[in-house]
Amino acid sequence: MVDVLNIESLDLEARGIAHRDGKVLFVEGALPGERVTVQTVRRKPSYEIAKVEEILRPSSQRVAPRCPHFGVCGGCAMQHLAPAAQVAIKQRALEDTFWHVGKLKPARILPPLYGPTWGYRYRARLSVRVVPKKGGVLVGFHERKSSYVADMRECHVLPPAVSRLLLPLRAMIAAMSAPDRMPQIEVALGDEAIVLVLRHLLPLTDGDIAVLRAFAAEHGVQWWLQSKGPDTVHPLEREHADALAYTLPEFGLRMPYRPTDFTQVNHAINRAMVSRALKLLDVQPQDRVADLFCGLGNFTLPLATQGREAVGVEGSKALTDRAHEAAARHGLGERTRFATLNLFEVDVQWLRGLGYFDRMLIDPPREGAQAVVQALSLLAPGERPRRIVYVSCNPGTLARDAAIMVHEGGYALRSAGVINMFPHTGHVESIAVFESLDEATVLQAQAQARQKAREEAERLAEAAAA
């Protein structure tokens, strides 16, 4: 059955949203404001999934996708939408999530942070599959909503130097001893080097090593090898062990890293994000600052150039060791401290043990920082950071954590905005600023939170006894 629908909005999977007979329809390929005919492909009790058959009235924001693989490849979802409109949808999603999850509205919306629209992805994981029906070896991202590997010949979100490697990599893998036992190639670009990490499930032969070296010489790349877990990653050539680094020119910093370390995908946006975060924190020379989930010290080292001391805490000792080395190399050893700790299990006693911080930066993974913000919310007015900047890659956990800080801890959500870290995708990176309110407001929020917790405990006890 073909229906005619008016598309009202867009979700973060780039599906148009419409309503019919009290039911939500998610329409693949449709944009807000468009009138389309659709074919339903899946029916559920509360919603349907459909695909566009014909666009009767196109959106003024619709653009021609640059990539010939768009719609099949799962690497991008929004190439058919103008970049500014993509960011507007992400901003709306952030604001909606704050309200629906936390009943919060930022006092101020920060202007979006923009960067390169194409060629921005300096880190990627490419899958490798042998598919005889498609001509042999495929190297690329997965197909949209599928475990199959897309038949990619180019990629416009990868830097051109990497996009040009997709077809040569196919031929190289095909020439090796066990192409079907090499499932993955990770790509990591520094400011001066391209590193490829080959995952191989069988030992490489001398012939395989020769093939890798010939490819590296021809294409100007460096090979690292991974036979098992992350601890087995090592450079094919020993002299390449310290090849990767990115820079933060505003702060005079060079940050070395290994190809499997976590670094931001988009180097240009990362520089802008660090700059904005420090401006929002407004660190003073006498301030002591904490950087939680600090990784390689992406924020810690810039903070140390401005404050009295920066303390970075991270769950990976390998990362904190590299952060410490980078700090020492830049003469910041006496103004930085690093600790290795699982920040998903901390409590208020641990937080107090770190001492007083004037400012705090929190940059967690997608799981958010629930344990950290619960501990923060229990701190007395005189022992808590006055200002906190929270960098997030998941609006849902940011909104959850913000609700704890505001409703239970007496913080105010002063501002928030999106960072366009991943153009053409539904990923939403954002930044939010919290400030501690006056003592009376903090104590009132904490008292109300304790009362609510008591009432919930009593309710659960009554339910268990019934």
Swiss-Prot record:
GO MF assignments: 4 iron, 4 sulfur cluster binding; iron ion binding; RNA binding; rRNA (uridine-C5-)-methyltransferase activity
Keywords, ordered alphabetically: 4Fe-4S, Iron, Iron-sulfur, Metal-binding, Methyltransferase, rRNA processing, S-adenosyl-L-methionine, Transferase
Binding residues annotated for [4Fe-4S] cluster, in chain numbering: 67, 73, 76, 155
Pfam families, alphabetized: TRAM, tRNA_U5-meth_tr
InterPro entries, A to Z: 23S_rRNA_MeTrfase_RlmD, MeTrfase_TrmA_AS, MeTrfase_TrmA_CS, NA-bd_OB-fold, SAM-dependent_MTases_sf, TRAM_dom, U5_MeTrfase_fam
Catalyzed reaction equations: uridine(1939) in 23S rRNA + S-adenosyl-L-methionine = 5-methyluridine(1939) in 23S rRNA + S-adenosyl-L-homocysteine + H(+)
Active site annotation, chain numbering: 393
Annotated EC: 2.1.1.190
Coiled coil feature spans: none
Protein name per the record: 23S rRNA (uracil(1939)-C(5))-methyltransferase RlmD
Source organism phylogeny: Bacteria, Pseudomonadati, Pseudomonadota, Betaproteobacteria, Burkholderiales
